Amino acid sequence: MQESLGYVEQLREDIRNFKAENNCDRIVVLWAASTEIYVPVEEKVHGTLAALEQAMKEDDKEHIAPSMCYAYAALSEGCPFIMGAPNTTVDIPAMWELAEKTKMPIAGKDFKTGQTLVKSGFAPIIGTRCLGLSGWFSTNILGNRDGLVLDEPANFRTKEVSKLSTLESILVPEDQPDLYTDYYHKVRINYYPPP
């Protein structure tokens, strides 16, 4: 058995054991781990459930993130899956297909507890009042494990893609091209370890 499939099977067994040992009727799996390395959505791998399963059989680590294994295991065991990080796991058609097949919901796309939460609060105020925007600078200073993980460029890229898309989804440049088409948007996360 390939490593990814072995990982999925172990996760499925862990879910079954947890459910039995704790006498649970239902389980909801919530991903609240650190941000993973950015995995762009690839149609040939993520476009269908069959393609995703083939990539897992081939142990395609470039396209199969750990959270995808967790989501796959959860849905396969009849558990809803909630994504608490900006990973692409719940953005792929293959996962939607599995959710539909198992009749289990998938939800979430980052808990947005820091700069994105603030941005999500202020951007609608700017948009509603038709205030122009020339730039937006976002920063987080993190001294915890998240900061350490996000100090790695590949992990930061996942967070950056999520954070950059927030303004565009709220301000909708197509609706107000004179106000929101040509603004500068910079996202930074700084790791500052505690002494």
Give residue ranges: language-model regions.
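Active-site-lining helix/loop region of Rossmann-like oxidoreductase modules
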Residues: 97, 102-104, 111, 115-195
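Metallocofactor- and cofactor-centric catalytic cores in central/energy metabolism, strongly enriched
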Residues: 1-105, 110, 117-121
